[in-house]
Amino acid sequence: MAEPKVDKDSLNTIESEHVDSKEHIHLEETFYILSKKNSVFRVRLTSKGLSLAKETDGSSKEQTILLRDIVGSKCMRSKRRRPGAGSCVCSSLVGRQQLKVVDENSGDLDENDISAYLYIYAYILKPSRRTLKRERTTITLRFRSFDKYEDNNKEAQKWRATIKCLIVGLPITQTPPVNDKRLLILLNPKSGPGKARELFQAKVAPVLQEAEVPYDLHVTKYANYARDFVRTRNVYGWCGIALAEVPLAILPCGSGNGLARTLCHLYNEPYVPQNMTGLSMALARGSTAPMDVVRVETKSKIMFSFLTVGWGFLSDIDIESERLRSIGAQRFTVWAVARLIGLRKYRGVVSYAKIKDVSNLPKPKQPLSLSHSVSQDGALDSPDAEAFIDCDEHSDIFANSANGRQHQRVDSWYSVNSRRSAFFSTRGSEYHSVTSSSSEMRSPVHACMHGPASHLPSLMSPLPSHWVHEEGEFIMVHASYQTYIGEDFLFAPRSQLSDGIIWLLMIKAGISRSQILSFLLGISEGSHAEVDSEHIKMVPVSAFRIVPEGSNGILTVDGELVEYGPIQAEIFPNIVNLVVPNMK
């Protein structure tokens, strides 16, 4: 049966009150949803996002998928059906058979179907128990208002080009903007429990493919491979590394993931361990923000740090729990109990340049609330030339497309000879296999360390007179310049990416184990930062120096072991551009 014709003028009248007068409407069209009778949709593409206004039996309801939650779109054609199944667009599908689509240039397309299908990919926020998570949503628009496929495809391509321009913030054109730069992705297969390959395959590559972002993927082959790689390659050939001119991105595959957790916290992006959807979207979008970097100096090395410098209790846990790496982040909890039982003390001198006024810092952020898209559960189908649907054989074609599970990628990740990146990666993306001829041999690197010069005296020279000195026995000293230093370690609640502040925590000997336990429990919520006792002190500083006595102990920089002995650090604001989630 044919569905009744819709009066477009009356539809405009009903729905006009739902559209924000400040939003600019770029495109709009009327669609029918095939799985539901008497349901008409007015779909608008605005400066805010994709608006779906549903009109059913006189009632009206509007929902919007925000532009910041849309990663990309693609035009498709229906696939040629198997012999005997019938190729007429009006023929019935058997059971709940789903529409099969192929690329518009495929040789396996159905030439009898004049429809053009636009798939719009989004990852929207959904409540999940006590937190939020992103859920993949696909909106399918079927264009068949014209008698020829070429005309329908032209209309679909216009929507696709407009979506792409809005996503990247460029003026609207008739053709999608071309991404002529690639991402450089360095993957550490040994990070954390060793599941980086699987996480990239399942969580990152699909988002980059849907966003049509080309990339080069290099799997690290030995310790410091990434450092050697960027020292000896021209990194300006890539649009980002996953440096003030070449932005840096982080995708958490390890155990700590402090920087990734910090980004999600500061930019209202839900963080779910081993679910990198939000940060993958950020990588595809390429929005950036400046980040401070800390210059760290030891007796034999100069390095640049983005997360922490540690001495004592937490550093002991970080390094000594490596033997439990296979269990992931839980290793920190297990080893914390062990170190609490066998509590150690370290004698030395801690000196620092205190920042006196931090009153202008923002208050700690509140937990994330749901303020993103709410998508329409259903796929949409445009009317034909007479604005009628005269058969219902496709009633189940898109029934599951909005909230259906993404098909598991089964491409061969481990192919010895493959240089393609697999996982339906965008055309031109490359995977550089760990089985290359150079994988077993580490070539010498002849490059120097570049970075800002120090403003401090040399490591063994006297410090300025205004510095504060703390001498005695310490349980731990830990400095951080990020909000989180681990998935559940809210170390510095007031910290920002580019505030020029190092938060220096000192816990002196004499504190009881119960007080340390209470302190550790408070770290998960950040309440420890308000404690100021004779044994616990947290100070905002611009630089510090630690001079431990003896030779037995552990010092770490960003969770990595460094030589034990004098160490000093100073912060340099806005040194790195970091890829961050989109807040627009």
Which residues does each PLM region occupy?
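Eukaryotic intrinsically disordered and solvent-exposed regulatory patches
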Residues: 28-30, 35-39, 57-59, 102-107, ...
